[in-house]
């Protein structure tokens, strides 16, 4: 019959890729790369004094892969890092905010600038983190490769300017 193992008993369980989807190692790589670039950015080093409020909106899945759950985990990870970093007050991406976004969205899979600005003012948010992930998929007789490109950016609510953006590349392959 099947055998079961805990990752706490065998940490190597998380090392191997099991699919072409995004796993914990991919999300940690993305979070670490984004956070390092974000914290080293001119945007963060030149923040004005006073209250700085940020909220993580959404990361749009523009791939053919079923990675919605992984992207929601990444959103929560970004929120956690921002909360623990102490530079910003974080407005949680909870069901109320999601509902407002879905109700006011006027086009596409991303939140348009007018909606983002209105939500920011309504919620007292200075900056929004949001993004999208796309992919390029190739297949041969015995292999399938997915190259993900994740774009995460920070938009200033009052000006609608993108004040920070980072690209993170992740490649997964299955053979056999």
Residue ranges and their predicted role:
Residues 1-87, 174-175:
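A structural "domain/chain start" motif
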Residues 3-4, 126-174:
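Amphipathic beta-strand/beta-sheet edge segments enriched in Tyr/Trp
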Residues 60, 94, 158:
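Short, flexible active-site-adjacent loop segments at beta-strand->alpha-helix junctions, enriched
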Residues 64, 82, 108, 145-146:
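Alpha-helix boundary/capping detector
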Residues 71, 75-76, 85, 90-140:
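Short, solvent-exposed, polar/charged sequence segments at loop or secondary-structure edges
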Residues 79-83, 114-118, 153-158, 173-176:
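Glycine-rich loops and low-complexity Gly/Arg-rich segments
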